Every structure is written in structure tokens, then in C-alpha cells.
């Protein structure tokens, strides 16, 4: 440990397991850590972390910065004191204890708890999948490799090794992937009689067949007995708030949960407003950037209509739900802004563990109900340690984590009424059996649908049609020599 005085600040240098941080007290009495290292951790994406992945456990107010972007060993005027190089661009996270009142937490709990359902859309965050999970029968990497070997005509290794034994050895310790296909159980049972143990029987069949016959048989299994939909490991997760456009749903909108539970959702507004206020106070530069985007957006797409937040990811862990996160970077939130993490509970129910770990800087945070973590979750790899039941028993396990953010794709939206009109237009096409593109199960969407006369004519019939054409479709007006007769 080395102590120094720099710019009137008492600074100490801490080294643990060969990793070094500079540490000093901030202007609010918080601990400030500056990592002088950055450990590559992309190989951890999709994998779980435990206590071996951090050296510093933070459970009091703290700021943690990534190392300076400069090369300290080559800078002639560098005094090896990183304080003067730190700004919001190097901030990994800020952690503050006891930010939210019990009333604010209760409102968030009641307003958001029911939005979390079993989900397969969390990708890396969902963690490694197991052979049977969430009512799905996964095609394991081992099974995939066996099928590939036989489908490829049983190629002979140049080293003379047994390819089946090589595949078995390869998968003895290898972690499963985070996303994959599933077996169609009904098809498997129709072919093999029972699902349990069928792959051992299948391997015996493959081995007993001539090469060409085995190849065709395996190709048939791949085609007809495996779903072509890719799934992630299931976890209890949900989205509340608002969405931007999506290719198959090309209009801004409320999430399904908010659309059907608006009054309940509004209970989270005081919590969201407190979070937004603390964001502005603690990271004013990044907040100002996010506010620029929020000010361009129709306020009806903002949570509470007065924050810089559009969307909330909700994850829950109870006695029968597990929301442990594998290592991941988040996507979709505004790059110029900043994200966050909070956890809440109800009736004093708690948990053990569940530390959020940032393995690149070897730090973990013990987030408890009422605390606020502001984190650069698009840049910093993070996951959490196992979440365990309290001493009172598994039935008292209850943990809900919330991530509030501004969705970057929402910057492309028009006004609330314009986006609503886009939705009405899609629905009108979908329900119109006389439409030239109509077919069973058509969703009403087609290529170039927003740049043709059918859409322009639809807008003409609306009170704000001319205004919307001028704002969002000037090309429609350019096609007319005058506006006279435009609304014929």
C-alpha cells in the first residue's frame, strides 16, 4: 500500500491478488476507486460468476472508475496519479445506499411485480442452459456434435482417434451454451417409444447402419425432430414501459403489461422520479445527454411523462423463480446516457448473495433494498453471484431487480398520436381480407409500406394528416406540384 497527497486529496494505493486500485474519499464521503487494470473478460460472457471473480466487495457509498485511457508508461508528464484524468467517460458505476423510501419501494413493487414472466429472450444474461429446463428438452452441444458427425458421413480423423470418444471427452467439462434448439418430444416418442434415454438408443442405431443410411437418417432427425426456433435458458423477466419500432411491429407503443395494467404501472412513478433525480445529481453530464433525447420524444413515451426514462426490465427471484444473471453486456439502452440497477422486496423478505460482479475490474456490489447503482451496463461486463434464501427459509425468498433506461431506438419515433395511427394502419391491413396482400395469419406488414400511396392516402383522412406528411413524409409532398387537391 502506498499513500499520497494529490490535489489536496489523501490517496492510498491498494493491491490485492496483483490488481491495483487508487482509493480516496469523494466529496460526499464515498469511497472512490480507480482501477489501474482492466482484465479481458469476454470469455465469461454467458457464464456465471462467484466469489472468485472479485477482490473488492462494495457495500457502502462508492464510485468506481475504469483505468485512464492514456498509456501511463509512455506519458512524459504523467505522475501516476489518475485522479486528474477521471471524468464521467471513465465511470464504471456509482453506488449509493438507502436512496429510496419504503413507500417508493412499495409502489415500485406493486406496480411492476406482475410484469415479470418466464422468458427466453435474455440471451447471455440467462446463463448456461441444462438438458431439461423450463419445460423444454434442449438439444445439447454433445448431441449436436454427434449428429453433425453422422450427418457429415462419419469422416475419419487423420490421427486415427475414435471420433465418438473424442466428442464424449470434449463435452465432459464443457459448459452448455446459452441459446439453442429443442427436441420435439412428440416426434421423438413416436420414433423411439419414450423420450427418456432415446439418444443412447439413437447412437446405437447410427453405429449399426451403413454410412450412407446413417447420414440420411440423421438428416431426417435434424429436419423433423428438432424445432427450428432458438431459445435461451428460461428466467423470470419482463419489460414495462414503452417500446420503439420493430420490423414486425413497426410503431412505438406501450408494452403489453402497461397496455393492460396502466393504473397499476403508475404506482412506480415516484420511484422512477427519485431515480431520475439522483441520476441528474450524481452524473450530470451523462444525464444532460439523455435529457436531450428525452426532450425530443413525446412525453407520453416517458415514464411518468417527466423523467428521462422509457423502459424498465424487471427480474424476479422467489422460491420458484430464479433470476440469476450470467455475465453479459446490456443492449438497447442509450449509449450517451447511463443505466442503473435497483433491487426491492416486500414485507421484509430478503436473500443472501446476489452480488453484482464486474470481473473486468474485480469488484462486486452488495445491493440491498433501497440502494441505487448507476452503471455503464453497455460497456461493463456484469453478472451476479448465486442468490440464496434467507435463514428463515426458501419460502421467504423474494428479490426483484429493476433496470430503468432510455431505449435508443425510441429516438426515431414520431408523436404519440402518429405512432398510434401507424398501429391502426397496420391493424386495418391485417383485418382487411380484401387487401391484395392479405393471407391467413398475415400481420399487416409489408416491405416499403411506409413509402407508398396507400399509406399517404390513409394519412390524408386524419385531422393531422398534412402535418404528419410534412414532418415524417416530405417525399409525399414533393410528388405534388401544389397542395391543391391533395386531400381529394
Model-inferred region functions:
Residues 337, 346-488:
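Catalytic core of Fe(II)/2-oxoglutarate
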Residues 87, 97-99, 318, 379, ...:
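A broadly conserved detector of short glycine/acidic/proline-rich loop/turn motifs that flank catalytic sites
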Residues 1-240, 483:
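Fe(II)/2-oxoglutarate
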Residues 241, 247-389, 394, 398-403:
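Active-site-proximal segments of catalytic enzyme domains
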Residues 2-19, 27, 34-35, 108-112, ...:
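Charge-centric, low-complexity intrinsically disordered segments used as regulatory activation/interaction regions
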Residues 23-25, 36, 47, 74, ...:
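Context-gated lysine
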Residues 50, 323-325, 458:
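A subset of signal/propeptide-processing and intrinsically disordered low-complexity segments
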